Amino acid sequence: MSEAEKQAVSFACQRCLQPIVLDEQLEKISVHAMAELSLPIYGDNGNTLDPQDASSFDHFVPPYRLTDSINGTGFMLVSDGRDNKKMSAAFKLKAELFDCLSSNSEIDHPLCEECADSMLEIMDRELRIAEDEWDVYKAYLDELEQQRVAPNVEALDKELDELKRSEQQLLSELKELKKEEQSLNDAIAEEEQEREELHEQEESYWREYTKHRRELMLTEDDKRSLECQIAYSKQQLDKLRDTNIFNITFHIWHAGHFGTINNFRLGRLPSVSVDWSEINAAWGQTVLLLSALARKIGLTFERYRVVPFGNHSYVEVLGENRELPLYGSGGFKFFWDTKFDAAMVAFLDCLTQFQKEVEKRDTEFLLPYKMEKGKIIDPSTGNSYSIKIQFNSEEQWTKALKFMLTNLKWGLAWVSSQFVSP
């Protein structure tokens, strides 16, 4: 490609960015033609910059000029890329020409033939729209000119006087209205103040209401809680009224050949060796039961006083200051000691005294087993069983103790029936 062809394709269309070939006549443009092209297309309309818009002038961006670019940025250069410092005079002339055209119109130059035709069509369309608008304005102006008539001065003066009188009347009415407005404003202020006071009273009322409502809710909660507690207490009271304290505290039953009190076996068998600590505990519970029953009916034993002392309970002989132990430890020496037997006989005597006291109060009361002189008699067989352990078999002794506990259970049942509230 020749040098001339390279320079002929040095610009691009500013719309489609396609490379364009310039007409050769642009090479021969004169200085006078350049000067004329530099003149603005539109004359100065005499408008000055509005002070309010002065701040926006700082953000004004002038149109891009080809000559302001060092390397021709903004145009597509398809030449051999030589340094811009060596740009030919013809290229600079063309660049200045396009800058002049761009600064005097809203369209950036150069344009290719197709884009120029497209822009001409757009401008023709805008021109036709402007001409149509001008025709409309011209017709309206002609109509206004035809309607213009000579003014009637007298009628206008009369109308002016009427307007002045109307103005005075309106001013007077306005003054009255202002007074009325002031009066209404004062009334509104008073009403507003009263409203504020009522609002404060309402707020105070609601605070008091909320406070009392909360206290009421707490009181109702306390009331419901107390009602629940009372109901529970009544339930427990009814349950306690129906409950026999003696039956709960002293459970007399049997386990095979043994009589038991609170699950402690009273007695021994050759085949069942009951530990003496269990026998002593059973005697302690038995003494405690008889003592409680006697105290309940107000009975004081003659000759003896039963003393509950756990597994070391005893019977005190009144007048002799002597204690008869109701506990033992076994062994050869124990079986030859008569104090344990004497204590059991004394206890049986106290139980007999309790029986007689109950029979005085209730003639129909009768124990299932008769007791006399340290023995218990089975009415079904007529056999008597000694409560002593000396010179007695363990079977006989255990059966006597079982019968004794049975009699004691009957006495417990009678006392419970007499002293339990209906």
UniProtKB/Swiss-Prot annotation:
Family: Belongs to the beclin family.
Region (Disordered): 182-201
Coiled-coil blocks: 119-243
UniProt superkingdom: Eukaryota
Transmembrane portions of the chain: none
Keyword Coiled coil: yes
The entry's keywords: Coiled coil
Protein name stated in the entry: Beclin-1-like protein
Phylogenetic lineage: Eukaryota, Metazoa, Ecdysozoa, Arthropoda, Hexapoda
The organism of origin for this protein: Drosophila melanogaster
